[in-house]
Amino acid sequence: MNSTNNTDSQNLDPNASEVEKLLDESAEAEEKTDDHTPPSELFILPLNKRPFFPGMAAPLLIEAGPHYEVLTLLAKSSQKHIGLVLTKKEDANTLKIGFNQLHRVGVSARILRIMPIEGGSAQVLLSIEDRIRIVKPVQDKYLKAKVAYHKENKELTEELKAYSISIVSIIKDLLKLNPLFKEELQIFLGHSDFTEPGKLADFSVALTTATREELQEVLETTDMHDRIDKALVLLKKELDLSRLQSSINQKIEATITKSQKEFFLKEQLKTIKKELGLEKDDHAVDLEKFMERLNKRDVPQYAMDVIQDEMDKLQTLETSSAEYAVCRNYLDWLTIVPWGIQTKEYHDLKKAESILNKDHYGLEDIKQRILELISVGKLANGMKGSIICLVGPPGVGKTSIGRSIAKVLHRKFFRFSVGGMRDEAEIKGHRRTYIGAMPGKLVQALKQSAIMNPVIMIDEVDKIGSSYHGDPASALLEVLDPEQNKDFLDHYLDVRVDLSNVLFILTANVLDSIPDPLLDRMEVLRLSGYILEEKLQIATKYLVPRARKEMGLSAQNVSFQPEALKHMINNYAREAGVRTLNENIKKVLRKVALKIVQNQEKNPSKKSRFTITPKNLQDYLGKPIFSSDRFYEKTPVGVATGLAWTSLGGATLYIESVQVPSSSGKADMHLTGQAGDVMKESSQIAWTYLHSALERYAPGRPFFEKSQVHIHIPEGATPKDGPSAGITMVTSLLSLLLDVPVLNNLGMTGELTLTGRVLGIGGIREKLIAARRSKLNVLIFPEDNRRDYDELPAYLKKGLKVHFVTHYDDVFKIAFPGV
């Protein structure tokens, strides 16, 4: 059964004859008593939310179900009384409730009227009469119980009368603050003569927002003084709450009123200014702003014609129209482009070289190219735009060198990444017909830098994508072509913009994924990975001082021993760049900062100083991440060490060969190690070449007769490809065939042809760095790469014995000196 107290229907499945029998028993008991005596046995209706109080009329919503039937029968009988009792728990399941889940004190109510409602439910009007106490359950199924009635002591004392006056006073105050029950309160107060303080207390408490437990406590209080005390406490709480709500409402109304007043005053002021000619309309304000910008710019005539047409159009449009907003935004972009504004060029070579050396260690090729650019600008009385592509592993300083170039040239710097970009509109802008259209990144760069000759860095150009929206790489062709970018056309502006004075710097990790037409427009400068000595210098001169400053530390607080930095580089940060090294330095300094603060809190007068050594480095960084790059301290039979390079830098590449009996009875070769197509072809070339030149290198020996040769490239989870492992594969097979190990500490790289010729390869610097890291001091490079090797700095070549070869015969003599 549901009511205004959210009472649910009980799962009773009523039997009409059983209920009628119970009613007859109650009627017989009533006949033996006086007509005005209330029934001693009542059906109990559980309530969930709030209890009712005597002296009130209350509506109750009853849904179709067992209790509806019971109440209907009660209404037709002479008894017409029912008990209303609160459940102990608000979420009690009233479908299967027992007397032990009900409070003992409730109220009796007379059924005045039952009004059916559509859907089978009904509205029951009850007159709440007396407090009752459940004395003894009579019938559990229908919650019928024997009850005792509480009769009020109607003796009125002066103290009770004073209490009553206090209650009425608080109710009147509530009436002023909360008009929700205004009519009911006025009727009650008009008929109140203060002769029944108990009824007054019950009525006042019923109007509050007190909790069900607080209300039940008042209902169970039979002593008049205690009940009125509790009622006064609840009323005062309600009064405080109403005052707070009233204060909040007044503040809100005051704010709204103030805002409305300001709005009306502003509108009046605007009207007065218009009448006096002091206020301009929106058209005039916008046009004045655009003209002010144009006066500071040297706008080409073709662009000025478009701007003038749009300004004429703007004057004819209503400011509230959507077309006005589109036209105004278009003019905003057209006039904010820094037409004719360029940064003054500086050609001080010494200062430029000083800035570059201060910001970066090494990178001599890059620094030389920037100095050449400045020199050309000085001689030509002006520096045209250039397109430079910096290629190298992550963390070697490609982005930071771009910022340094902008600083050297005294130009603004703008950077954006095209990694994963699939929409050409990001480059060339959206057409104005689209909602939310805006120019592309290049026009945005001009707006943000406010000059026509900024340094624009386009990052991650090797990771650019394409989709049905277009091909951003193709869109870049126009941008990066010196013959075309002076007439660059953005789709949104639809006006030619001169980008020929912009210095474009592109960055990439590898060149393989860059389309050839795009690559053809760039001047490629390679940034190789750093060796131990270079990383040590970078850490000492740049990373440690910068990180100390960020952490609020100084050289007096913490210092790194050079050996500690070497240990960190070799065992925790072995990547080609210095990004991980920088993070590890910061990690150490954060832990040092924590210790310093902890020591200061314990002993403020004591100054802490920490020295990072190889011994205590593990306390800050944990166990070393890397071990030696070398798989073998002494090279076994069938193993040759190659040199490779990836987007992450150089690496050693071991080629392992073993032979097992062939199931087919023929010589066969099998390659594993996630090799790519080109590397698979290299293994076939090595196999065929060795077979054809067997008498030259292993006279009298059969070529793996009845054996299957398994060639494996370790670290099988890493994809590998490229032709530069050709001579290494032949050397591994020869070592297996001759049963002779390859010269220890030998590393090699080179592409092999079927005739034994050794061709040039790429990544000489990276491979040299990998060889030094693995302590390989004898190296074999193709003769075609001698020039690349000669251009390397001396400190990279120090302590290495390098052989340049043109044919595999030369490789054989070096790899197998005793054969």
Swiss-Prot record:
It is found in: Cytoplasm. SUPFAM superfamilies: P-loop containing nucleoside triphosphate hydrolases (SSF52540), PUA domain-like (SSF88697), Ribosomal protein S5 domain 2-like (SSF54211). It comes from the Bacteria. Signal peptide: none annotated. GO terms for biological process: cellular response to heat; protein quality control for misfolded or incompletely synthesized proteins. The gene is lon. This is Lon protease. Residues 42-239 form the Lon N-terminal domain. The lineage of its organism: Bacteria, Pseudomonadati, Chlamydiota, Chlamydiia, Chlamydiales. InterPro entries: AAA+_ATPase (IPR003593), ATPase_AAA_core (IPR003959), Lon_bac (IPR027543), Lon_bac/euk-typ (IPR004815), Lon_lid (IPR054594), Lon_proteolytic (IPR008269), Lon_Prtase (IPR027065), Lon_prtase_N (IPR003111). Belongs to the peptidase S16 family. It comes from Chlamydia muridarum (strain MoPn / Nigg). It holds the Pfam family LON_substr_bdg. Keywords: ATP-binding, Cytoplasm, Hydrolase, Nucleotide-binding, Protease, Serine protease, Stress response. It catalyses: Hydrolysis of proteins in presence of ATP. Homohexamer. Organized in a ring with a central cavity. Residues 1-41 are annotated as: Disordered.
